[in-house]
């Protein structure tokens, strides 16, 4: 996908005429490795080779607008009503973002009214009175809690109904905290707002524990989620090692992207096999997964497998397990996945039993347990900074954009880019290389290079 500078420009509602509460402190700032001036931009690419492909002057190279406070803002804070909604699945840090938005709006911009719309459908006609007035007192301790005080839900809503709700509540700036579905909803909402000629800024704060949203170094909540997942891998590793012919399997979230499985496996440093959606694998054959697990059990007495939920979805019907296959779609239109954890458990157990290695199976599916927890210290800081950036963007009249961290800088990313593609583990990248080095598994099941390393005892 080739992007040009115009693809990365963010829509502005109009001229910024009001003094920002940060104008004085900004006048003392100077561009440095740790500060990007408001008129500067952050390059899309960060390698010489990729920049050379564009053959453009630096001012024309693809780049994002830097996030942060501006000297002049578009909205008069004294007249602003802000709205906040959380969409999609839970994620560590949702309450931290809500708290950060409310604090920044109230304390620094002196915004008098902030409306929280409950459960996503709170924006529709039937539920538009299902709101909560958000103040610093209301959100004071919510960062210590998992989930979201506003509730969340899946499923599309009518954009025109949502716009009417915003108009009835007098909302001037709207913050949408959500994943790919939430960003699509924010895009539709923005289009409906523009069609009606309303002066409402819509800013997204992208979230997903899968880390599968593009144009962000890492999505908030991901670090908390994979840290929690590490505990389950460590637990199943202890169980497998203590059992005769033990095989431990941990199934983790990751519908299309295997970041949680990869990072958690690296952190635990005890997995023998990591399976992700981006890297297909075969079960059968001398160099398939089942034979590999058998060799592990014979060589060291046990094996630990970490699998992302979206891995191996092509294997179900081929192995006569249609009852485990996903059917239909969920409320957000996502195809329901087959249970790869159960497929692996039954297949490995049957294979080892037939090979005369009666296995002791240990299977853990922590599922929601890794996403419903409070944010850890890292994500708490990250969420707060994203919230600050979102408020600055909205008050400066930016709209139809999300705030994200890119190349260590906070930037504004147009909604059109947030939903254009999916962030995935690169099988040729250094992250997957680290996984292969740590597990000693073959680059693909069908290769024989890992056999000697298994028997040598290094893995």
Curated annotation (Swiss-Prot):
<feature type="binding site">
    <location>
        <begin position="154"/>
        <end position="155"/>
    </location>
    <ligand>
        <name>ATP</name>
    </ligand>
</feature>
<dbReference type="GO" id="GO:0046872">
    <property type="term" value="F:metal ion binding"/>
</dbReference>
<protein>
    <recommendedName>
        <fullName>ATP-dependent 6-phosphofructokinase</fullName>
        <ecNumber>2.7.1.11</ecNumber>
    </recommendedName>
</protein>
<dbReference type="InterPro" id="IPR035966">
    <property type="entry name" value="PKF_sf"/>
</dbReference>
<dbReference type="GO" id="GO:0003872">
    <property type="term" value="F:6-phosphofructokinase activity"/>
</dbReference>
<comment type="pathway">
    <text>Carbohydrate degradation; glycolysis; D-glyceraldehyde 3-phosphate and glycerone phosphate from D-glucose: step 3/4.</text>
</comment>
<feature type="binding site">
    <location>
        <position position="180"/>
    </location>
    <ligand>
        <name>Mg(2+)</name>
    </ligand>
</feature>
<dbReference type="GO" id="GO:0006002">
    <property type="term" value="P:fructose 6-phosphate metabolic process"/>
</dbReference>
<comment type="subunit">
    <text>Homodimer.</text>
</comment>
<dbReference type="InterPro" id="IPR022953">
    <property type="entry name" value="ATP_PFK"/>
</dbReference>
<feature type="binding site">
    <location>
        <begin position="368"/>
        <end position="371"/>
    </location>
    <ligand>
        <name>substrate</name>
    </ligand>
</feature>
<dbReference type="InterPro" id="IPR012004">
    <property type="entry name" value="PyroP-dep_PFK_TP0108"/>
</dbReference>
<keyword id="KW-0963">Cytoplasm</keyword>
<dbReference type="GO" id="GO:0005524">
    <property type="term" value="F:ATP binding"/>
</dbReference>
<dbReference type="InterPro" id="IPR050929">
    <property type="entry name" value="PFKA"/>
</dbReference>
<keyword id="KW-0324">Glycolysis</keyword>
<keyword id="KW-0808">Transferase</keyword>
<feature type="binding site">
    <location>
        <begin position="253"/>
        <end position="255"/>
    </location>
    <ligand>
        <name>substrate</name>
    </ligand>
</feature>
<feature type="binding site">
    <location>
        <begin position="208"/>
        <end position="210"/>
    </location>
    <ligand>
        <name>substrate</name>
    </ligand>
</feature>
<dbReference type="InterPro" id="IPR000023">
    <property type="entry name" value="Phosphofructokinase_dom"/>
</dbReference>
<feature type="binding site">
    <location>
        <position position="309"/>
    </location>
    <ligand>
        <name>substrate</name>
    </ligand>
</feature>
<feature type="binding site">
    <location>
        <begin position="179"/>
        <end position="182"/>
    </location>
    <ligand>
        <name>ATP</name>
    </ligand>
</feature>
<dbReference type="GO" id="GO:0005737">
    <property type="term" value="C:cytoplasm"/>
</dbReference>
<comment type="function">
    <text>Catalyzes the phosphorylation of D-fructose 6-phosphate to fructose 1,6-bisphosphate by ATP, the first committing step of glycolysis.</text>
</comment>
<feature type="active site" description="Proton acceptor">
    <location>
        <position position="210"/>
    </location>
</feature>
<dbReference type="Pfam" id="PF00365">
    <property type="entry name" value="PFK"/>
</dbReference>
<comment type="similarity">
    <text>Belongs to the phosphofructokinase type A (PFKA) family. PPi-dependent PFK group II subfamily. Atypical ATP-dependent clade 'X' sub-subfamily.</text>
</comment>
<keyword id="KW-0418">Kinase</keyword>
<feature type="site" description="Important for substrate specificity; cannot use PPi as phosphoryl donor">
    <location>
        <position position="181"/>
    </location>
</feature>
<keyword id="KW-0460">Magnesium</keyword>
<keyword id="KW-0067">ATP-binding</keyword>
<keyword id="KW-0479">Metal-binding</keyword>
<keyword id="KW-0547">Nucleotide-binding</keyword>
<feature type="binding site">
    <location>
        <position position="89"/>
    </location>
    <ligand>
        <name>ATP</name>
    </ligand>
</feature>
């Amino acid at each position: 996908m080739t992007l040009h500078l115009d693809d990365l420009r963010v829509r502005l509602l109009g001229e910024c005429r009001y003094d920002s509460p940060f104008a004085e402190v900004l006048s003392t700032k100077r561009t440095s490795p740790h500060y990007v001036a408001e008129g500067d931009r952050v390059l899309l690419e960060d390698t010489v080779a990729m920049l050379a492909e564009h053959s453009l002057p630096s001012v024309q190279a693809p780049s994002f607008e830097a996030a942060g406070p501006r000297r002049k803002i578009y909205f008069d804070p004294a007249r602003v009503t802000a709205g906040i909604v959380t969409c999609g699945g839970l994620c560590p840090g949702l309450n931290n973002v809500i708290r950060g938005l409310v604090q920044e709006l109230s304390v620094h911009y002196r915004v008098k009214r902030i409306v929280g719309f409950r459960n996503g459908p709170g924006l529709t006609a039937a539920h538009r009175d299902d709101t909560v007035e958000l103040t610093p007192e209301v959100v004071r301790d919510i960062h210590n809690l998992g989930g979201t005080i506003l509730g969340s839900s899946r499923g599309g809503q009518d954009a025109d109904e949502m716009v009417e709700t915003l108009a009835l509540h007098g909302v001037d700036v709207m913050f949408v905290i959500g994943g790919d579905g939430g960003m699509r909803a924010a895009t539709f909402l923005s289009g409906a707002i523009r069609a009606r000629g309303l002066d409402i800024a819509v800013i997204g704060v992208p979230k997903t524990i899968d880390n599968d949203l593009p144009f962000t170094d890492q999505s908030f909540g991901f670090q908390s989620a994979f840290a929690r997942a590490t505990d389950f891998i460590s637990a199943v590793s202890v169980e497998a090692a203590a059992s005769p012919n033990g095989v431990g399997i941990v199934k983790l979230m990751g519908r299309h992207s295997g970041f949680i499985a990869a990072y958690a496996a690296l952190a635990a440093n005890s997995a023998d096999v990591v399976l992700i959606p981006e890297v297909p694998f075969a079960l059968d054959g001398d160099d398939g997964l089942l034979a590999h697990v058998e060799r592990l059990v014979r060589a060291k007495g046990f094996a630990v497998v970490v699998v992302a939920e979206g891995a191996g979805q092509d294997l179900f019907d081929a192995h006569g397990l249609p009852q485990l296959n996903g059917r239909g779609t969920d409320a957000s239109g996502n195809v329901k996945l087959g249970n790869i954890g159960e497929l692996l458990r039954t297949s490995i157990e049957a294979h080892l039993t037939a090979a005369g290695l009666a296995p002791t199976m240990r299977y853990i599916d922590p599922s929601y347990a890794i996403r419903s927890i409070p944010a850890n210290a890292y994500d708490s800081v990250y969420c707060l900074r994203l919230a600050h950036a979102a408020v600055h963007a909205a008050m400066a009249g930016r709209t139809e954009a999300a705030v994200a961290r890119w190349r260590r800088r906070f930037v504004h990313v147009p909604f059109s880019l947030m939903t254009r593609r999916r962030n995935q583990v690169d099988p040729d990248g250094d992250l997957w290389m680290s996984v292969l080095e740590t597990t000693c598994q073959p680059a693909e099941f069908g290769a024989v290079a890992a056999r000697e390393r298994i028997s040598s005892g290094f893995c």
